[in-house]
Amino acid sequence: MARHTQDQTSVHWREGGKASRRTFLKSTVGAGSALASFSITRSGWNAKSRPRWQSHTVARIPEGYQVAVADVNGGGRLDVLALSSQKNIVDWYQNPMWHTRSVTTSTEDNISLAPLFRRGYPVQGMALASGFHLDHPEQGGDIWWAQPSASLDAEWSLTRIGRIPASHRLRWADLDGDGRVELVDVPIVGAGSRPPDYSVPAPIMWFQMPETLLTGHTASAGQQSNNWIPHLIDESLNIVHGVLVMDWNGDGRDEILTASTQGVNLFESKGRGAGLQWTKTLLSPCDQSSDRYHGASEIGVGKVQGHRFLATIEPWHGNKVVVYTRRTRGFSERHVIDTSFNNGHALVCADLDGDGNDEIVAGYRGPGTSLFIYHSTDERGTRWERETLDTDMAASCVVIADVNGDGRPDIVAVGSSTANVKWYENLGFA
């Protein structure tokens, strides 16, 4: 088993009183919402507390690229979904025995998946992006709506709902606060981009779901495809790699944060439906001094002592984990907390130990294949301690979810060269 160590002071923690209670505030978690929101209460926990972790193998998958969780079969447990970027594999694994079932084997060069399984929501299924070709983006970019079949063992029915070259990240978001979600599609580059600069900006889009799906009236595949209406959000950013959907400003609608060559940008909307109007705000330019690529490629948001911070991997597929804390003029205070990454590709923020402060979970795909947890050691989020979670995880994607239903946030990750899907069980206090 890969080692699990703390890179600095070794500490053990004990629970004061009975097990803490964590309650999901949202019933859907996926690659598009890497963190399920928890309401956490605890007593008797000190600032040096650390959860214990136990790794479990979910599956082997060649060149694993994206992972998500959702209650696919309605069994009350979060199942795991994953795809391979090299093989025509899009699978889901049924919790708790992790029986492998195929979503589809008919798509190639898969790149992103966004499950939609919300309790009480009128439609269930998954958005899937395939045909990814970074160096020749116009050769692909297919976007699919996949609906489960009546049999758990049957592949899902696919409807192509759009084609946007270099589609790279799919996310569900309630963009106008009406309780219905829209599909956000973020290409990494624009059509016509070529290496090494990839200079054509990416058209960030959102799709309105067909009314026929939302009302439960069955339509033909062709009608469904035509009714997924695309709308442009922005077309000014290059190499848009990281995407985070969250209610940034507490207005009851989801905002979009991106990590790109230009740094971290926030997109906020006003209006309703097809009339949405967008405002872009630069939160941080990030790394603009590297020789080849600039900006950031992953973005996470957390809080320490109630103060928000940004966490990034810099630059594109870079070697640095960076934290930005807020000063009078935005997130202008930069703290490089790790420079050891080799092809950094996974990052999420979450309160893993219930102390009210968020940790950072981040990993990389290159030699060393490691996944780490970073713990803040001061009240401002300027100093961090690294804990090694796994050295057998070439982390391409990581999400946080309560996998076993014990109320604790667990970690789920997929590895590329390590060809694995794992979940890391939060065992609580020793």
Question: Each PLM stretch: what is its role?
Answer:
Residues 13, 17-23, 28-430:
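Beta-propeller-forming repeat regions
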